[in-house]
């Protein structure tokens, strides 16, 4: 992941790939 996306959108310690609308529900499986 790109650093600027990583620090901008980090929810519960899980990076949301810079897409706040997805939050961590989609990426929680990763």
UniProtKB/Swiss-Prot annotation:
Single GO MF annotation: lipid binding
Domain of life, source organism: Eukaryota
A Gene Ontology BP annotation from the UniProt entry: hemolymph coagulation
Record's keyword annotation contains Cell inner membrane: no
Keyword Amino-acid biosynthesis attributed: no
GO cellular component, as recorded: extracellular region
Keywords (A to Z) from UniProt: Hemolymph clotting, Lipid-binding, Secreted
Protein name: Fibrinogen
Quaternary structure, from the entry: Homodimer.
Native source organism of the sequence: Panulirus interruptus (California spiny lobster)
Job description of the protein: Clotting protein.
Location within or outside the cell: Secreted, Extracellular space
Tissue and organ distribution: Secreted into the hemolymph.
